[in-house]
């Protein structure tokens, strides 16, 4: 027990040099102002930002807006890209639906039935299936991009958040309601395991380092759990900022990042080896910057944020920080050369 407790403590090493990142572009996106996931597609170099009734597509190098996918009255949340099928996927969370769209023209091709609270979406390259997390329904809709049709529904129960594909045909899903990570076999669409993360309040952000078999789970109580993706064991618990809604991993620099919208920071953690993690100096961003994508080839980070509405308290029900209408933007942050 003592050894396990020691392994779960954060490793703080002041001698470790924190990386320098700076904002190099601010791309105005404008209304709608209610936004969610930010996804970078390495094949096209495009950044997809879900906000309101549309998805805005931005060139990840120049910052030019190259297209829009719309219109979705049920509000968009997640995005997945399937290059081989020339299709992208997004959802209408409040309507319990999803849709496919053409990656070149951005025209909607087909509307698909999902379930209540359709939210995060991811593509698993092993099964070649798209997985839609129906957050409020506690289920996952499985789509075959070849036929653009649902092929299965996985009933999980409990509110779900983000998901990532893993090694050997596994899908890992944050179970926000039950403080757990769910492991799913994407060949059979069956649940393999429920792994508890008891000190993680409402798991939200999720990323993976397949090489070290590590999952990185961000929590609303200012913690990040490092979880073994093969056994489900919690390897370490690290401090992060307030309001994390996304985690990304940079395999070249062996760094993981948590975007924290409530205090306007990015927490930075170095992976020294699969058992040793070091909390570094956070990057200052702006309050509301809570979702994030990464270009793993260059290390560039992409964050959606908006200007805060002065003298307006957060929404009592959702906790969202009120923002100024039409002020949504996409921030580009680059590491120092």
Give names to the regions the model predicted:
Residues 11-337:
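Predominantly soluble domains enriched in secretory-pathway, periplasmic, or organellar proteins
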Residues 1-11:
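Bacterial N-terminal signal peptides
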């Amino acid at each position: 027990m003592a050894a396990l407790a020691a392994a779960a403590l954060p490793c703080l090493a002041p001698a470790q040099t924190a990386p320098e990142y700076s904002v190099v572009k601010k791309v105005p996106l404008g209304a709608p102002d209610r936004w969610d996931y930010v996804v970078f597609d390495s094949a096209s170099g495009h950044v997809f930002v879900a906000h309101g009734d549309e998805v805005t597509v931005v060139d990840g190098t120049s910052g030019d807006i190259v297209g829009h996918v719309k219109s979705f009255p049920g509000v968009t949340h997640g995005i997945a890209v399937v290059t081989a099928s020339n299709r992208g996927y997004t959802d209408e969370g409040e309507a319990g639906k999803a849709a496919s769209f053409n990656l070149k023209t951005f025209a909607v091709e087909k509307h698909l039935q999902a379930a209540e609270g359709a939210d995060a979406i991811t593509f698993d390259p092993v099964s070649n299936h798209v997985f839609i997390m129906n957050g409020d329904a506690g289920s996952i809709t499985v789509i075959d991009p070849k036929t653009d049709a649902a092929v299965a529904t996985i009933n999980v129960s409990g509110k779900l958040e983000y998901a990532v594909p893993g090694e050997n045909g596994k899908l890992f899903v944050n179970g926000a309601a039950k403080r757990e990570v769910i492991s799913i076999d994407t060949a059979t669409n069956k649940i393999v395991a429920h792994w508890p993360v008891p000190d993680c309040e409402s798991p939200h952000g999720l990323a993976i380092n397949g090489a070290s078999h590590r999952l990185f789970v961000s929590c609303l109580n200012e913690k990040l759990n490092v979880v073994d993706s093969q056994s489900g064991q919690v390897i370490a618990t690290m401090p992060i900022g307030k309001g994390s809604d996304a985690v990304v991993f940079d395999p070249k620099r062996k760094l993981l990042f948590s975007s924290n919208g409530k205090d306007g920071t990015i927490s930075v953690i170095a992976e020294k080896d699969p058992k040793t993690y070091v909390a570094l100096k956070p990057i200052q961003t702006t309050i509301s910057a809570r979702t994030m994508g990464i270009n793993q080839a260059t290390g560039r980070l992409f964050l959606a944020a908006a200007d805060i509405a002065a003298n307006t308290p957060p929404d009592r029900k959702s906790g969202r920080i009120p923002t100024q209408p039409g002020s949504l933007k996409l921030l580009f942050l680059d590491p120092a050369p």
